[in-house]
Amino acid sequence: LMNKLKDYYDVAYDLICMHEFVLSLEKLKREHAVSAMDIAKGCLDYGIHPPTMYFPLIVSEALMLEPTETESKESLDQAAQIFIKLYETALNDPEKLHNAPTNCYITRPNEVEAARNPILTYQFEND
């Protein structure tokens, strides 16, 4: 997966890895205003669980991809194609990623509002 993505994204540590690796999206954010959060939210529109964001803290705009050892080659190839599509979207239509996810039940929440005014209980609907 790392080898398929390193032509598109900057790999933070270009070393042999067992299964996890870290991408730095610092250049993508600087040149196209697309953050690691935007790419992670874009993953949701393709049915992929977003990777770990902003960790490790020493890598700017970090995305840590760590597929499990049970993933098939086909699913890893599919994930690579999705990350490549997200990269191309970042270059050609960054606003689409700023609004992602758009195909999910819940779209992108206002994270500042959620942090400042958390709703800590769930109101169940009466059947």
Positions of PLM-derived features:
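Non-catalytic terminal extensions of PLP-dependent enzymes
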Residues: 1-127
